Amino acid sequence: LPACICSGPSFVILTVGEQLLGSRSAGVCLFAAQVLAGWLTAALLCRVRGIPEPLPAPPAGAQTEPPPALDSILAQSAVTYLKLCGFVLYFRLLAAGCGLLLPEALAPFPAMLLEVCSGCDYAARTGLWASGLCCAALSVQGASVLLQVRTLCPPEVSLRPLLWGRLLHLPLSLALFYLGLPQDAVESFNTLYARVVP
């Protein structure tokens, strides 16, 4: 699970990199850092915790129920999709509220903890540390993503490895991001001015 939670390449490369930071190459470096940090995090967690025992197979007699009907599957899918969208909207509104109440320099931090898109949006406006803060926002993922994962996973799947994974992922992704950038790119990304939106 810790290696699977990552924002998609189109969001990271095109939206965060190209649109928010003004550089597609920054987006590629961000995405590469996120994927590599996810793999390293999963490898470290497997090394520390060991490979988990597989869940026991259900008894043969328990499979006598007929499979659910197609209409109930579609209805359940629609409800789940609405829950996922609801988490994004709810935490985006909370992040926007924090952005209005807090000074501009502090606005990215609660946004990062609440919702990844808001975190990247506020982080990109900081100028000096925009690329590093966007990397941190992508690594943390926010409460919205954690609740989306909780909604999609069955109750017997623990989120504890994912939470530990996020703690490991953050320093790894930042280190990989800055190690993977050429020095002149680091200097130019760290001196970006806040974007002006007409």
Model-inferred region functions:
Residues 26-42:
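Alpha-helical transmembrane segments
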Residues 1-2, 10-20, 118-126, 146-153:
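Generic transmembrane alpha-helix signature in multi-pass membrane proteins
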Residues 9, 13, 87, 91-94, ...:
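Alpha-helical transmembrane segments of polytopic integral membrane proteins
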Residues 10-11, 35, 39, 130-198:
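C-terminal transmembrane helix pair
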Residues 70, 74-138:
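Transmembrane helical segments that form the transport core of multi-pass membrane transport proteins
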Residues 20-23, 42, 46-55, 100-104, ...:
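Transmembrane helix-loop junctions in multipass membrane proteins, especially transporters and channels
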